[in-house]
Amino acid sequence: MSRFVAIFSLTLALSAAIVAQEHSPRRPPASNPPATPAAIDNDGGWVRFNSDIGRFSVLMPEIPTDKTETTPSEHGPYTTHLFVIRHDPNVYLIGWVDYDPSFNFNRQSELAANRDNFVKGIKATLVSTRPLQIDGYQAIEFVAETADRTFKSRVYMVGRRPYQIVIGYPKDQEDQVTINRFFNSFKIKPS
């Protein structure tokens, strides 16, 4: 039950971030970037975002905002982390959950549950899904659609930590170069 709650919480956070980003005006770039647990380097107009706490790096059009929330549960607390930006016309998200060490779960079921709860959370239809092995990590990639947007996502299992990366864009504006740049730049750092 608490696994569902944690997955559902991550899904709600991702879904809320998508809705909020799509319905809010684009914020102007800050002259001094907000403090984040990351270092940045300019990379061809995009920013290399390095998260020490998340143990990953990724290229994004700008520095994402951070939302972290710890929730108590019957199996111990879990912490949901979410980084999100809107860079017209796309929305970019990276999220993960840190579970209590005593909480045990099935990794394959975790991948599918993250996918299913994300699709349900944004009221989308699952178009396709496929299993992947990325940099030695078990993963799935899926595509979901709402009436006007397409979402491509990868969910990784890295030890006990599920990561989810998402790019959402208008249905008629798929840019495979941008999608590949974002997905292929996501790298897990050794712990």
Stretches found by the model and what they are:
Residues M1-F4, Q21:
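Positively charged n-region of N-terminal signal peptides that target proteins for export
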Residues A6-A16:
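Bacterial N-terminal signal peptides
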Residues L14, A20-W46:
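Compositionally biased, proline/threonine/alanine/serine-rich low-complexity intrinsically disordered stretches
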Residues A35-T79, Q133-I134, F183-S191:
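N-terminal "mature-domain start" segment
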Residues D52, P61-D66, S109-T125, Y163-S191:
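Surface-exposed amphipathic alpha-helical segments
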Residues G54, D88, V97-Y99, A147, ...:
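Solvent-exposed coil/turn segments that connect beta secondary-structure elements
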Residues L59-F83, N114-G159:
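Signature of long, low-cysteine stretches enriched in small and polar/charged residues
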Residues T80-S109, Q164-V166:
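A short acidic-to-branched-hydrophobic micro-motif
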